[in-house]
Amino acid sequence: MKVDLNADLGESFGRYRLGLDEEVMKYITSANVATGWHAGDPLVMRKTVKLAKENGVAVGAHPGYPDLLGFGRRYMKLTYDEARNYILYQVGALYAFVRAEGIELQHVKPHGALYNALVKEEELARGVIEGIADFDKNLIFVTLSGSRPAEIAEEMGVKVAHEVFADRAYNPDGTLVPRSKPGAVIEDKEEIAERVISMVKDGGVRAINGEWVELKVDTICLHGDNPKAVEIAAHIRKVLEEEGVKIVPMKEIIR
């Protein structure tokens, strides 16, 4: 049994510092690097790509809405063409640094409000996936496990990684409970580990109302921007390995 561990990194910019990138990088196999629109800047992008290379971690682009002040967590209405070209632009920006460091770009994972909007808006999802395909159809599109965007990508011939979230509560329909609601973010490392094992070995997890939600798991998102991020990441990796699960980059799972 194999699974990838990913985290959103490179989200500092200018004088502002966010996340514990150097420490979290030790426990993951894929890094989602911010591409400058919701967070990140050229210096941070280069530094993060280099850090991933040094740690043997695969690199992916983490594009979002053009919303630096809102950290990409505010919804924006985009046309198909806007979505397609916004993604192409941001992926291309990160690829410049990936190429400069002599490594490969593995995947694309949309950020924040854009990630969530794809699940509800098929035209938006098609635009985003087309933008990925415009750049390189061999890139892996990371999206919410079992969601409509995953189906669309498969229909379009784009590789897909089904993603689950270690520290987020689920609705019965498999979507994430909004951060604004009580219980949306889980902070206890033992509870998080139990849920991750359930997802990987049992193929699902209990929703916030107690119902069972089936989930396909290719990659698990570990958030790197909370105070306990390093402790949680280390614990999850340890528990998975003790259960006999191999932790590998998603390119070794999605072929």
From Swiss-Prot:
| Gene Ontology biological-process annotations | carbohydrate metabolic process
- Keywords of the record: ATP-binding, Hydrolase, Nucleotide-binding
SUPFAM superfamilies hit by this protein? Glycoside hydrolase/deacetylase (SSF88713)
InterPro entries tied to this protein: Glyco_hydro/deAcase_b/a-brl, LamB/YcsF/PxpA-like
Gene3D superfamilies in the record: Glycoside hydrolase/deacetylase
Taxonomy, superkingdom: Archaea
Query: Is NAD there in the keyword field?
Result: no
- Supply the enzyme class, top level: hydrolase
Q: Which reaction does it catalyse?
A: 5-oxo-L-proline + ATP + 2 H2O = L-glutamate + ADP + phosphate + H(+)
CDD domains cross-referenced by the UniProt entry? LamB_YcsF_like (cd10787)
* E.C. numbers: 3.5.2.9
> Per its UniProt record, what Pfam families does this chain match?
LamB_YcsF
Gene Ontology MF term list: 5-oxoprolinase (ATP-hydrolyzing) activity; ATP binding
Tell me the subunit arrangement: Forms a complex composed of PxpA, PxpB and PxpC.
Q: Which HAMAP family did the record assign?
A: PxpA
Q: Which family does it belong to?
A: Belongs to the LamB/PxpA family.
Q: What does this protein do?
A: Catalyzes the cleavage of 5-oxoproline to form L-glutamate coupled to the hydrolysis of ATP to ADP and inorganic phosphate.
For this entry, the protein name equals 5-oxoprolinase subunit A
Source organism per entry reads Thermococcus kodakarensis (strain ATCC BAA-918 / JCM 12380 / KOD1)
Whichever gene encodes this chain, its name is pxpA
